Amino acid sequence: DLLFLMVGAVMLRTHADTIEELGGVGRKMPVTMFCFFVGALAAVGVPPTNGFTSKWIIYQALMAEGQPLLALISLIGSVITLAYLARFMHAVFLGQPGRNLDHIEEAPLVMRAPMLLMAGMVIVTGVFPGLLLAPLNDALAEYGMPSLDVAFYGLATGPGAWNATAVAVLMLVAFGGAGLGLRFLLT
């Protein structure tokens, strides 16, 4: 799992045993911090990651089966996940340095490469969910199980549809525009 690889990279480079010993590591390990951020977004279920697609399917299935309370409990679980991962992100990567960071370096390539590959796959399969869902659908159909209405760019389930590619493009435009606007305002 992406988050476990990231924790291993931080432990290798810092030799820290507790979160309290860390802080500000993101300045020295930006690739590791980026990979953690992508993994955290997926765990919480934020578009355009594959975590959102997974949670979308679960929420839609629960709603279709008349289980809105279970859908709400699942959503609350995602909010709790957001809280502890945000705390971890701040404590390890963004907070005040817990000690001297001069000796800390980015994770070695042998650790960075799998993290970057996994982070890339989290985003690619989130933007194009049909890459994984179409073969899964075929397997479900072989066993007579209900399948999803899947396209390369998204899916339709029960009362809703999800076009992951369109949402990813809109998010890119929105965040890119906001970043340019902020840069313009600050200069």
Question: What kind of feature is each model-predicted range?
Answer:
Residues 1, 5, 9, 13, ...:
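Membrane-spanning helices that line or support transport/gating and their immediate boundary helices
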Residues 1-4, 65-105, 171-187:
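Predominantly late transmembrane helices and immediately cytosolic-facing juxtamembrane segments
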Residues 8-78, 88, 99-124:
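Interfacial and helix-entry/exit segments of alpha-helical transmembrane bundles
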Residues 18, 22-25, 59, 93, ...:
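Hydrophobic alpha-helical segments of integral membrane proteins
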Residues 44, 82, 92, 96, ...:
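Phosphate/oxyanion-binding loops and surfaces in catalytic or ligand/nucleic-acid-binding neighborhoods
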Residues 111-187:
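Membrane-interface and transmembrane segments of multi-pass membrane proteins
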